[in-house]
């Protein structure tokens, strides 16, 4: 029978730990081991004080030791948990932390009885039989739920076709506990690109049927046992274990923090993918303030996606199926909205992205309408809109399905083509489009950021890479991330020239030294569904921030070197 580990410190050990605390400033430390491996490196250990909304995590070193620095844990009773695929704690674990003394908590791990429940999306794709093309169908499923829901289902192919039809009618910011239906003729493009232009066709129907048959071959429709073995990823080692992660719980489990940024005052701002709020969190206390956004279209799904700051520090959000954009004046707390002209709207009108970062140049804010992949522009003073329409690849004549959009320093627009491997540059004055291609075919650029040198950094979702377009050289560099099926969603470059990206599939944050090509992958303590990524350059080392879109929390990762 497993013993509950309410951990105390003996008098002899206390003297040693007090000395270690004085030398290294340790609040809580211990060793993690298992009968199978002995000392275990790369185990993520999390401590959460009773009644707190903030959890702190560290990882074990090559000797299996973990250490929580003094100042990160207040005095009190803490529950401990671990993340190490293939293992569970041998009983409940807790520790009492006291001011001025280092507590010790050695943790014993045992093989898990349910490895399948611990697998990430990437590990499911690595484990399941099938071609890469078959598996890529699932890359549009992880925005609403993990693959656990799919692989644990008992649907046959015909039942999966019914599920597909039902899912196509849900708002992308839906979750199992908070579903929202689309309105009228609006339908989602399952397994496709950015825009609805790909639509329904005989070929597409055949592809959906093939996908349904494949999914029925890897789930539990044939019985309680799977025909394939599991392939978990290795735990982090070396530099990747040198981190501290802080996770802040948000006030409701239904909050979906899609985009997270940190302003010059150190406040954390986030968009809510499933509600009409702009959120602010004080990272010192975890206190959350919500600013309601007025509803524009009654009866339509609610939620916001892209969140950006303009030059005056105002916060903007794209209002998705509400058909507009909103701006929060942080000084007054007032929220102002602008609606897309009614004559341009359909049931599928969707403002997922807005780029106000260079509004100071000409007073214009770029806006993307996912319906038909249209590019629009708002004159903030007059409230007048321009519709630039949709664009085509000059080589293939196929529609450019922009996902992310980013204004450069001159307020020209970068368009990231989620249907192919294009980076478009639109000049609002001439309405001319310049197109550059990544060397990785069908890389599907998703989101990105313009740096101080006016270069565009972007994530290549299907390319499993990040790229950088240099407008001076008119060239693109690419870095493939080390773990298969990471599928980066976004990327940002820090003050040192390191590029940071995250995975919706692996729960790992990748740091790329763009000068040497060295890559470090940090494992987060919980399933995080990483989307928009942000780096706070005011700290040394820099701090990485992301919203846990499915976990109702905000996560900060601090590398220790």
Report the location of each language-model feature.
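A short, solvent-exposed loop/turn motif at the edges and junctions
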Residues: 51-53, 75-94
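Short, acidic Ser/Thr/Gly-rich low-complexity loop/linker segments typical of extracellular
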Residues: 50-67
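The canonical Cys-X-X-Cys-His
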Residues: 137-148
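Conserved beta-strand positions in repeat-built beta-propeller and related beta-rich domains
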Residues: 268-274, 315-321, 365-371, 413-419, ...
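Structural motif
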Residues: 25, 31-40, 73
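Blade-level signature of beta-propeller repeat domains, shared across WD40, Kelch, NHL, RCC1
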Residues: 524-561
């Amino acid at each position: 029978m497993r013993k509950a580990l309410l951990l105390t410190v003996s008098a002899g050990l206390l003297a040693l730990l007090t000395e270690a605390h004085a030398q290294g400033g340790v609040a809580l430390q211990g060793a993690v081991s298992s009968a199978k491996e002995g000392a275990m490196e790369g185990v993520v250990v999390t401590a959460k004080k009773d009644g707190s909304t903030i959890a702190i995590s560290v990882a074990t070193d090559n000797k299996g030791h973990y250490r929580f620095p003094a100042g990160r844990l207040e005095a009190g009773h803490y529950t401990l948990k671990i993340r190490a695929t293939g293992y569970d704690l041998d009983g409940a674990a807790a520790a009492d932390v006291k001011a001025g003394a280092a507590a010790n908590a050695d943790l014993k791990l045992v093989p898990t009885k349910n490895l399948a429940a611990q697998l990430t999306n990437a590990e499911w794709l690595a484990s399941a039989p099938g071609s890469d093309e078959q598996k890529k169908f699932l890359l549009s499923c992880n925005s609403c739920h993990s693959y656990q829901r799919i692989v644990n289902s008992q649907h046959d192919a015909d039942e999966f076709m019914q599920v597909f039809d039902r899912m196509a009618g849900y708002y992308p910011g839906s979750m199992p506990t908070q579903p929202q239906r689309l309105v009228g003729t609006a339908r989602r493009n399952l397994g496709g690109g950015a825009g609805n232009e790909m639509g329904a066709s005989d070929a597409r129907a055949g592809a959906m049927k093939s996908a349904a048959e494949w999914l029925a071959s890897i789930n539990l429709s044939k019985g309680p046992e799977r025909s394939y073995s599991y392939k978990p990823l290795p735990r982090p080692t070396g530099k990747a274990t040198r981190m501290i992660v802080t996770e802040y719980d948000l006030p409701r489990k239904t909050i979906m923090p899609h985009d997270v940024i940190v302003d010059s005052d150190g406040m954390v701002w986030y968009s809510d993918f499933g509600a009409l709020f702009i959120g602010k969190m004080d990272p010192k206390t975890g206190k959350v303030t919500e600013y309601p956004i007025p509803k524009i279209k009654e009866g339509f799904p609610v939620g916001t996606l892209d969140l950006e700051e303009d030059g005056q520090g105002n916060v903007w959000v794209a209002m998705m199926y509400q058909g507009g954009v909103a701006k929060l004046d942080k000084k007054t707390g007032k929220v102002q909205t602008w609606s897309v002209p009614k004559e341009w709207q359909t049931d599928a009108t969707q403002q997922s992205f807005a780029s106000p970062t260079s509004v100071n140049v000409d007073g214009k804010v770029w806006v993307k309408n996912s319906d038909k992949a249209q590019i629009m522009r708002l004159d903030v003073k007059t409230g007048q809109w321009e519709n630039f329409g949709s664009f085509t690849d000059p080589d293939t004549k196929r529609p450019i399905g922009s996902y992310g959009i980013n204004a450069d320093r001159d307020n020209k627009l970068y368009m990231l083509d989620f249907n192919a491997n294009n980076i478009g540059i639109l000049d609002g004055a001439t309405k001319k489009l310049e197109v550059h291609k990544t060397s990785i075919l069908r890389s599907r650029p998703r989101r990105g950021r313009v740096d101080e040198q006016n270069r565009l950094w972007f994530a290549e979702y299907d390319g499993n890479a990040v790229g950088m377009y240099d407008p001076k050289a008119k060239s693109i560099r690419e870095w493939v991330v080390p773990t298969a099926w990471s599928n980066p969603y976004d990327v940002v470059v820090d003050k040192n020239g390191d590029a940071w990206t995250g995975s919706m599939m692996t729960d790992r944050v990748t740091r790329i030294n763009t000068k040497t090509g060295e890559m470090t992958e940090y494992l987060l303590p919980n399933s995080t569904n990483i989307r928009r990524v942000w780096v706070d350059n005011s700290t040394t080392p820099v701090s990485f921030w992301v919203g846990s879109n499915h976990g109702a929390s905000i996560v900060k990762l601090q590398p220790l070197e």
